């Protein structure tokens, strides 16, 4: 084991950094797109079915197939990081859109009516009342999306995007369990760390939301 760490330790750190980069960029884009789409659905209910339907379809496509389908797409496709990031972003959209929608429509109508009674515009109501109260639910969606992205990012190695999946594919090709574990264990630890950190923030936000509601 010591010899293995001495031999592959530096590469494990390098691949973990690549893995984290892919996931971080993909989740940032998914948040930037998913939250506005979730808000849009609350304002335009007719768009709920097509938007959530598209996100659901993305979830049903096998991950390796989606990576492969994106390769020949002009501009965004090809071998490397860009294709992997786009694929991870598409997979991350559903929980973020769905939880944003659920969190906002789940705000107590009495609170929103009180805001309307105070003369708030729709935008003021959204930013000062609905989003603050829905943050815990929205973050839960981000949490799920992040864990999913960390797991799926291992497939990115198949299209030359690097990451911890390099060890996994190399281990499968050479029937080497040590290489498999060198990719699988850090990826699992990364997912657990992200889940714990975001879960902690989510719990704090939920407590803050309950306190706000009780104060009202």
Where are the predicted features?
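Loop-to-helix entry region at the N-terminal start of transmembrane alpha-helices
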Residues: 14-22, 72-95, 135, 183, ...
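Glycine-rich helix-loop "coupling/hinge" segments at transmembrane-helix boundaries
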Residues: 72, 152-181, 185-187, 212-215
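Transmembrane alpha-helices
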Residues: 123-155, 182, 187, 194
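Alpha-helical membrane-interface segments at transmembrane helix boundaries
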Residues: 6-21, 52-58, 71-75, 135, ...
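Cytoplasmic-entry segments and transmembrane alpha-helices of multi-pass inner-membrane transporters
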Residues: 37-70, 98-102
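C-terminal transmembrane helix and the adjacent membrane-cytosol boundary/short C-terminal tail
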Residues: 105, 117, 124, 181-216
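Transmembrane alpha-helix signature in integral membrane proteins
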Residues: 11-40
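Short cytoplasmic-facing helical segments at TM-TM junctions of multi-pass membrane proteins
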Residues: 99-138
């Amino acid at each position: 084991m010591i010899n293995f760490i001495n031999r592959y330790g530096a590469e494990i750190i390098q691949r973990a950094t690549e893995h984290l980069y892919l996931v971080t960029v993909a989740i940032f884009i998914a948040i930037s797109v998913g939250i506005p789409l979730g808000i849009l659905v609350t304002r335009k209910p007719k768009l709920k079915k097509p938007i959530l339907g598209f996100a659901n379809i993305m979830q049903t496509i096998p991950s390796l197939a989606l990576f492969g389908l994106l390769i020949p797409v002009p501009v965004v496709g090809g071998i490397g990081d860009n294709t992997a990031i786009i694929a991870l972003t598409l997979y991350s959209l559903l929980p973020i859109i769905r939880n944003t929608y659920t969190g906002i429509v789940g705000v107590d109508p009495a609170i929103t009516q009180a805001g309307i009674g105070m003369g708030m515009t729709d935008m003021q109501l959204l930013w000062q009342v609905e989003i603050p109260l829905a943050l815990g639910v929205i973050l839960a969606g981000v949490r799920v999306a992040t864990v999913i992205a960390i797991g799926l990012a291992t497939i990115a190695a198949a299209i030359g995007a690097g990451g911890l999946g390099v060890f996994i594919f190399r281990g499968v090709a050479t029937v080497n369990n040590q290489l498999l574990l060198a990719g699988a264990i850090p990826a699992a630890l990364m997912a657990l760390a992200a889940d714990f950190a975001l879960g902690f923030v989510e719990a704090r936000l939920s407590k803050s939301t309950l306190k706000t509601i009780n104060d009202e």
